[in-house]
Amino acid sequence: MAEQRKKSKGKPSPIKKTPVITSSGTKGYIKYLAPVLALIFLIFLPVLRNGFTNWDDILYVTNNLLLKDLSLNGLKAIFSTPVVSNYHPLTILSLALNYQMAELTPWSYHLTSIFLHLINTALVFWFIFQLSSGNKWVSASVALLFGIHPMHVESVVWISERKDL
C-alpha cells in the first residue's frame, strides 16, 4: 500500500495579486508617469515648427482627396481605397479628422502624432506596471526608454508615418 502524504499544518502561501491601475488609485503612479510624459512632450515640442515633407506627405496628406470628405461615402472610400499602394484606413481616418479640424496646418498633424505617441507611452507604462507586479520605477524607466528611443522618432515627426504609431 502506498503511504499517504502528511499534510502540512503551516499557513497556506498567500496568493499574490497583480496590481491593477484604477481611477481611485491613480495618485501613486501619476507622479511617476506624468514626468515621463512631460519630458517626452518637451523633447518632441520643436517638431511643431516643421512642415510637410517632400516624401510621402504630399501623397498621404496634401494631395489626398480622401481627407476632405467624412460623409458616409467618404468613410466607405477611406476603408476601401489603398493610398500609395498601402491599406491603412485608420491612419487615413486620423489624417482626415486632422484635416477637418485644421485643414493643411502642419503643426496640428504633428501635435496629433505627439499625443498618439504619448498615449502609446502611457500604455507601455501600464503594461510594464502589470508585468512587474506594480513596480513604478521599472514601469517609468521602460516607458521613458520607449518614449525617447530614436527608433520612434520617424513615426512621430514624419506625418505620413503616423501609420507606425
Predicted regions and their residues:
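Polytopic membrane enzymes that build or remodel cell-surface glycoconjugates and lipids
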Residues: 2-165
